[in-house]
A protein has these predicted regions:
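Terminal-region recognition feature
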Residues: 1-174
Length: 174
């Protein structure tokens, strides 16, 4: 009987429905975390998935402000040469981040209404290279800012959840 129960459970289901707090060790149900803004009872702040954050901020629906095309995220053609991973290209990491997140850059920019006021929100996605801030992110940020200025939105929000400027892109990361 026990084997039948375990066979019916999809593999990895516990990973998708539950989150373990690294601070208090409590296991929380993810839908409950959404309603607490991904903050544990012990006040630990989990990474709030950007799309869920946007869902929680906007009144009903939002439009994504797409990343500009043809921006080189690796203008230095950086190649890592350390003992662990000899000679891999940084662009390979960026391609991996794109595949994992489904995003072109570490930003998700959106427009919609918050409390019946027009708004543009920019969220960093820490799953995209720690929320890197390189040339592609700079251009995406500027596109969202230009959109906000052009539309004269009431609210401009930037949720900065990032590891910082991407050192692999040099001065172009500024």
């Amino acid at each position: 009987r026990v084997k039948q129960i375990f066979k019916k459970q999809p593999i990895g289901q516990e990973e998708t429905d539950w989150k373990n707090c690294p601070q208090c060790k409590k296991i929380s149900y993810k839908p409950d975390l959404f309603y607490s803004s991904y903050i544990c009872e012990c006040s630990y702040h989990f990474d709030f998935p950007p799309k869920l954050r946007l869902d929680s901020l906007f009144d009903s629906g939002y439009e994504i402000i797409e990343a500009p095309k043809n921006i080189n995220p690796d203008p230095l053609n950086f190649e890592v040469k350390d003992g662990a991973q000899e000679g891999y290209k940084y662009m390979d990491k960026i391609k991996k981040y794109r595949k994992v997140t489904g995003q072109e850059t570490a930003l998700i920019c959106a427009s919609g209404n918050i409390s019946n006021l027009s708004a543009v929100v920019v969220c960093f996605n820490p799953k995209f290279g720690g929320g890197r801030f390189g040339p592609a992110e700079n251009e995406h940020f500027l596109k969202a800012a230009s959109f906000a200025i052009e539309k004269k939105v009431d609210i401009w929000i930037v949720i900065y959840q990032s590891s910082g400027i991407d050192v692999h892109s040099g001065i172009t990361g500024l």
